Amino acid sequence: MEKKAWLICICCLCCMCGVSAPKKNNFSVKRGVNISHWLSQSNVRGENRAVFFTEADVKFLSEVGFDHLRLPVDEEQMFAPDGSKEKEAFSLLHNALSWCQKYRLKAIVDLHILRSHHFNAKEKPLFTDRKEQIRFYDLWKQLSQELHTYSVDFLAYELMNEPVADDHEQWNNIVAECVRTIRLLEPERSLLVGSNRWQGYETMRYLKIPENDPNLIISFHYYNPFLLTHYRAGWTDVKDYTGKVHYPGKLIADEDLKHLKGELYDKFAYWNKVEFNKEVIEKHFKEVVDFARLHQLPLYCGEFGCIAATPKADKERWYQDMIELFDKYEIARANWDYKGGFGIIEQGIPQTDLIYMLTGRNIK
């Protein structure tokens, strides 16, 4: 009788251990690209949306050496205001995932923009309105319901792109509840979690990682120096500078800087306080590398890149330094982006030098 009771006790303990320690999956990636302005940040619908990204694109990306796609999706494209699914958008998403499987690419579905949260919006109700938080968790329940049949070794989820909360704890609380919500449905799915304030390296130390979860991936974005990577970008606060930029070293030559007057001088002299080079980038990377090592979790740079207007030679030197550091610290990454303003395709033409730097594949 005592022996039987002991066996029952052991079985119960084993079951409890199984619940508290989910199995580590085999999701692993290295070189990817963002499929932007398709199911995210676009007003295009119907046939024009369908032909923007096709099987031929996935085949091309596989052939030139990428091993995964980051697929940004927006709430307004995937879900109607009443919360019901937009069938056409989900059909396109499933098409993309099936093409990835066909051409042996892995995928990350990134919930990019919510009706309650845009990374550049002034008001972000997600952090202050409990109803919006519940709606966010419900979106993930529906996404999980739709996507759970894909292998955990093939597909990962990114909770949300570039959170921007007034207080770091607001985002930490949402991360904890969102992870719990998904884990009830999918205990072994890889989930990507980034820090508050645009997933910057500067705020990584404030991110609270849910404990005892081996299938989390720490994500950050890197666009420094911003004046170089977003050179003349019309939606940014650096759009007014039209002079030359340089990398590495001082971003603006002293000779060019002295020609700026008044507020323009004060604004852009800031960028010359640091001579930007590989050593500076490595110092920034070390912050996220050390954080990931502390938590014994893989690290992923989900966005990095230079806009098309950035001078080619300076852009290529920046990319070369970035890639060398990614490789040195074994950081998986996805370039921003494919066909957009930072794209490896410009006006339909593959940027062969950039592709070679990103993947090591010469397609000339």
Go through the PLM ranges and name each one:
Residues 49-52, 58-68, 85-113, 120-156, ...:
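An active-site-proximal structural segment forming one wall of the substrate-binding cleft
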Residues 11-19:
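Hydrophobic h-region of N-terminal signal peptides that target proteins for export
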Residues 19-68, 83, 291:
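N-terminal carbohydrate-binding accessory modules
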Residues 310-364:
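Aromatic-rich peripheral "rim/lid" segments of glycoside hydrolase catalytic domains that contact
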Residues 41-47, 75-91, 115-132, 314, ...:
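Surface-exposed, active-site-proximal loop segments in enzymatic domains
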Residues 1-5:
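Positively charged n-region of N-terminal signal peptides that target proteins for export
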Residues 130-275, 282-306, 328-331:
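Active-site region of glycoside hydrolase catalytic domains
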